[in-house]
Curated annotation (Swiss-Prot):
A lipid is attached at C19 (S-diacylglycerol cysteine). GO terms for molecular function: lipopolysaccharide binding. This is LPS-assembly lipoprotein LptE. NCBIfam families: PRK10796.1. Disulfide bonds: none annotated. It is a lipid-anchor. It comes from the Bacteria. One of its GO terms (cellular component) is cell outer membrane. InterPro entries: LPS_assembly_LptE (IPR007485). It comes from Escherichia coli (strain ATCC 8739 / DSM 1576 / NBRC 3972 / NCIMB 8545 / WDCM 00012 / Crooks).
């Protein structure tokens, strides 16, 4: 009986490992991006902390911005904007629910290659209860912190597509330089030989 249980458990592990299954909230970061520089205008801000945490969870080694290595990709965090629109109202016209939208822009600089812009957008709804002002503020802070975490996850999930775009641009560049045949010399048909 114990042998059968061990066999079934081993089989389950092999099946999940063989089909490409991976843990939730982890991304297959390309090997060329396993060492990165995180560049941010606010290195201790909530977005920088969330992105740094996501990079570490995905096995990326972060180097200091002032490092002397220039062969390492750099993730540069840009502007963050949070907008709040009314989603629903009470009968008296007061706002009952807000739709919050966080937009984050960033770019990945691959040395000797190109700069690839990426962005993330996170939507959340927030109920505004006028009877509980303090609880409302605490809930809004928690929602904004969660939005930073989701935006960081989205940015990290876009790293494999940047690597694919970089490979595609390399292929296009080599095909345009080697595949274009030389144009033949012009031959005049009006002049006699």
């Amino acid at each position: 009986m114990r042998y059968l249980a061990t066999l079934l458990l081993s089989l389950a592990v092999l099946i999940t490992a063989g089909c490409g299954w991976h843990l939730r909230d982890t991304t297959q970061v390309p090997s060329t991006m396993k060492v990165m520089i995180l560049d941010s205008g606010d290195p201790n801000g909530p977005l920088s902390r969330a992105v740094r945490n996501q990079l570490r969870l995905n096995g990326v080694e972060l180097l200091d911005k002032e490092t002397t290595r220039k062969d390492v990709p750099s993730l540069r965090l840009g502007a963050v904007s949070i907008s709040q629109d009314t989603a629903s109202v009470f009968r008296n016209g007061q706002t009952a629910e807000y739709q919050m939208v966080m937009t984050v822009s960033a770019s990945v600089l691959i040395p000797g290659r190109d700069i690839y812009p990426i962005s993330a957008k996170v939507f959340r709804s927030f109920f505004d209860n006028p009877q509980m002002a303090l609880a409302k503020d605490n809930e809004q802070e928690m929602i904004i912190k969660e939005m930073y975490d989701r935006a960081a996850e989205q940015l990290i999930r876009k790293l494999p597509s940047i690597r694919a775009a970089d490979i595609r641009s390399d292929e296009e560049q080599t095909s345009t330089t080697t595949d274009t045949p030389a144009t033949p010399a012009r031959v005049s048909t009006t002049l006699g030989n």
